[in-house]
C-alpha cells in the first residue's frame, strides 16, 4: 500500500524506517520525499518512524548533485568513500553499479567469495548485465541501460532521436529514450547525451534519485 506520512522540514536525507516486532530496524529504500512529507509503500500494519539520515559529506555541500547524493546515501544505496567523503567526481566500476542496483532491489548480498559476487549473480539472473569486466569503469550509456533493465525494460513511447550522438540501432537507444521520458536525464546540452563519457558517482546518484521519484 502506498502511503504518505506528513513530515515538516523534509529533506532528501529524510527516510522512513521500518521497525520490526523484534525491535530491529530497516530503512525503507523506496521512501521518497514529497512536498508535504515522505511517501512509501508498506505491507499491512507496519510500524514506521521518520528519521534524518543525511550523511553530511564535506565534499558535496556545494555540489550540484548534493540533494541526489543525500538521497541515495541516506538510503544505503551508494556508500561514501569514508564517513565524511563521497568523492562525487570519481568514476564507478561495473561491479559497484551491480551492487548499487542490487541494493535498490533488496537483493541479499551477504556472502560470496569476492565482495561483488552476489550482486554480479543478481545482475546476470535479472538480465541487467552479462557480469563481465567487474573492474571496468562504466560510461553513461551503460549506466542508463542497466538502470532501465533493472526497472523492467519498459518501452518508451518516444525515441532518443533528439540526441545526435545516440544511434537508433545502438544497444542503449531504448534505455536513453526511457530515461528521457521519465525525467531521468535531459542529456548534457547541445542535443547530446555523451554516451561514452565516464559516469561519475554524482551522476549515478542523480540518475538513481530521479528514477525513484
Where are these regions (language model features)?
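Proteolytic processing hotspots in large secreted/extracellular or virion-associated proteins
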Residues: 1-15, 20-22
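PLP-dependent class I/II
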Residues: 21, 34-37
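Exposed aromatic-hydrophobic patches
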Residues: 2-7, 37-43
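Short, structured motif recognition centered on aromatic/hydrophobic residues
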Residues: 98, 204-205
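Acidic helix/loop microenvironments that form the catalytic cleft of cell-wall polysaccharide enzymes
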Residues: 199-203
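Feature responds to low-complexity, polar/acidic, surface-exposed segments characteristic
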Residues: 24-32, 41-67, 74, 79-141, ...
Amino acid at each position: 500500500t502506498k502511503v504518505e506520512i506528513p513530515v515538516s522540514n523534509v529533506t532528501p536525507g529524510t527516510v522512513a524506517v521500518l521497525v520490526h516486532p523484534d525491535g530491529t530496524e530497516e530503512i525503507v529504500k523506496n521512501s521518497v520525499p514529497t512536498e508535504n512529507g515522505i511517501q512509501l509503500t508498506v505491507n499491512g500494519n507496519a510500524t514506521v518512524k521518520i528519521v534524518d539520515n543525511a550523511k553530511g559529506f564535506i565534499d558535496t555541500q556545494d555540489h550540484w548533485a548534493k540533494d541526489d547524493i543525500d538521497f541515495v546515501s541516506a538510503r544505503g544505496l551508494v556508500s561514501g568513500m569514508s564517513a565524511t567523503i563521497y568523492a562525487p567526481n570519481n568514476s564507478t566500476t561495473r561491479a559497484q553499479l551491480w551492487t548499487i542496483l542490487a541494493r535498490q532491489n533488496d537483493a541479499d548480498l551477504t556472502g560470496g567469495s569476492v565482495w561483488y559476487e552476489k550482486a554480479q549473480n543478481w545482475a546476470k539472473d535479472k538480465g541487467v548485465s552479462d557480469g563481465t569486466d567487474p573492474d571496468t569503469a562504466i560510461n553513461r550509456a551503460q549506466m542508463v541501460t542497466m538502470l532501465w533493465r533493472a526497472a523492467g525494460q519498459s518501452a518508451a513511447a518516444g525515441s532518443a532521436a533528439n540526441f545526435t550522438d545516440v544511434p537508433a540501432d545502438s544497444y542503449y537507444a531504448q534505455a536513453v529514450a526511457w530515461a528521457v521520458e521519465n525525467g531521468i536525464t535531459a542529456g548534457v546540452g547541445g542535443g547530446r547525451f555523451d554516451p561514452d563519457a565516464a559516469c561519475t558517482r554524482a551522476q549515478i546518484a542523480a540518475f538513481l534519485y530521479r528514477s525513484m521519484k
